[in-house]
Amino acid sequence: VASREYWAKLIALAEKHDFKIFADECYSEIYRDTPPMGALEAAVAAGCDPERVVVFHSLSKRSNLPGLRSGFVASGPKNIKEIRQLRAYAGAPVAMPIQRVSERVWSDEDHVVANRAMYQDKFDDADAIFAGVNSYTSPEAGFFLWLPVEDGEQAALKLWQETGVRVLPGAYLSRPDPAGDPGSGYIRVALVAPKDETQRGLTLIRDCLYT
């Protein structure tokens, strides 16, 4: 989770070098304890021009509706004007039935609270299952586990061959830097299956890789 300090440094860097920040906040409502600070909130707190930040939201994670393809962009009025013009020429129109469904889902917060509780329950299960694993950390938000392994690709292949559990090597989601590849020593596990299936999958991962 990006902290207030992280946002302040990034915004200061953007102001110094005159670039815009595009923030994907589709996971922002799936948190465990404390709501994370949003990019626009951070910009206001820093006294930054809201045109410096462009924020994207979606129903895909918030409401578990990835197939609906419904979202919105928030920024300053100049950016929004340009995005509207781009949409007019290059964007696909959203069918009216989808707009009506989206309107109802966006206006309802009860299911979002329930969604957070569901993931909290799964993370509690994960914390118990991986309690004895060194370097295991429980995330503050989202619905992914990043599990420490020696080699992400080898671990993912071993899991698939021996248990039928599919995970993603962390290196597939990271970019190497001078210190190496920060994702190579991890696998990413999505906690999106039903509770009992998730418990079974996590137990198989533990028994295959850590015992």
Feature roles, as predicted:
Residues 1-211:
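PLP-dependent class I/II
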